[in-house]
């Protein structure tokens, strides 16, 4: 694979979206995506599974907006499950981060119970 150097990169601070007239009504816009064959989101947003980003509060907020929050794994298993339950109590979709070790397989099994 040939790596081509990036000549220009932009961040959010480098771009401004200027509103303009449009014939399209907000009620006519569909931002939904099929994340998987059986999982559709109203908005194409998944929160990052980082300890400074997603616990139950963020997962609930993004879930209410139509996306999905992914609870990070930098918690002990029971605390991660508690965060997941807080989101599920709101009847929202939620994801959970797990690693690839045997211990993380046990984490995944505990989360799925």
What are these regions (language model features)?
Residues 2-5, 15, 53-113:
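Alpha/beta enzyme core
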Residues 44-52:
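Extracellular/luminal Protease-associated
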Residues 1-45:
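An N-cap/entry alpha-helix motif that binds or orients negatively charged groups
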Residues 34, 50, 61:
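Acidic/glycine-rich phosphate/pyrophosphate-binding loops and surrounding catalytic core
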């Amino acid at each position: 694979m040939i790596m081509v150097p990036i000549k220009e990169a932009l961040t959010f601070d480098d771009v401004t979206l200027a509103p303009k007239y449009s014939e399209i009504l907000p009620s006519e816009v569909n931002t939904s995506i099929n994340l998987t064959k059986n999982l559709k989101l109203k908005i194409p947003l998944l929160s990052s599974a980082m300890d400074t980003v997603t616990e139950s509060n963020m997962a609930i907020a993004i879930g209410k907006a139509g996306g999905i929050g992914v609870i990070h794994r930098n918690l002990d298993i029971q605390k991660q499950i508690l965060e997941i339950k807080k989101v599920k109590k709101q009847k929202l979709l939620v994801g959970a981060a797990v690693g690839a070790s045997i211990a993380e397989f046990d984490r995944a099994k505990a989360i799925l119970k």
